Amino acid sequence: MKILVCENYDKLSEKAAQIIMSQITLKSNSILGLATGSTPIGMYKKLVEMYENKMIDFSDVKTFNLDEYQNLPISNDQSYHYFMDDNLFNYINVKRENIHIPNGMANDIENECIEYDNLIKEAGGIDIQVLGIGNNAHIGFNEPTVSFEKKTYVVELEESTKIANARFFNSLDEVPSKAITMGIGSIFESKKIMLLATGENKAKAIYDTIYGKVTPEVPASILQFHDDVIVILDKKAASLLNPKDYKVV
């Protein structure tokens, strides 16, 4: 596990975008695993800038998103389809047919989960998976105690996660209670994983992820067993780590 600590959020976003750009430069038809939430927004802005400056070409890239709310229309401005269009896809030359996000409106939701994993496999697997992390160390919508073997599935959202996401809705009641998420088993199959975290409120989750026992109680702790993980933090998120364990960039 490689840990990089950046001066601030802007530098973190720049570093993460550079890693994505390097991946696409190396392999023009890269398969990207993408995440939503506030943390990767800066990275997406940097990627759009890189595209506008002709530094990066997404025309052969395929993308797979981690998750989507169940029973929330994609036209809703809180759906992850909308989020990805608004923050990235509308501003780059990725082909629509190469964008994959779980369909939370599917009639057969169980089949949607199976098909999503099959699509990833058929594409050749995810080359680099972007992750954020929750205060309780959840990744995707994989909450504490979920099995590390789990593939894409429907999850009942924890109250703490609903409260954390309520800021994006008019009220807590409007936050969907279920979502489709790539399971930890699906995430772990990615060839490379890039975990991003900022802020003091993530410091404990990062500490437990890196130093703690590998346990379903700390979902992100499974990353200790992955062969190729890069963790990019700002100073506050890294505040509990031993400085000898990370590189300041």
Swiss-Prot record:
SUPFAM superfamilies in UniProt: NagB/RpiA/CoA transferase-like
EC number: 3.5.99.6
InterPro entries according to UniProt: Glc/Gal-6P_isomerase, Glucosamine6P_isomerase, NagB/RpiA_transferase-like
GO biological process, one term: N-acetylglucosamine catabolic process
Catalytic reaction equation(s): alpha-D-glucosamine 6-phosphate + H2O = beta-D-fructose 6-phosphate + NH4(+)
UniProt record similarity statement: Belongs to the glucosamine/galactosamine-6-phosphate isomerase family. NagB subfamily.
Protein name (database record): Glucosamine-6-phosphate deaminase
Lineage of the organism: Bacteria, Bacillati, Bacillota, Clostridia, Eubacteriales
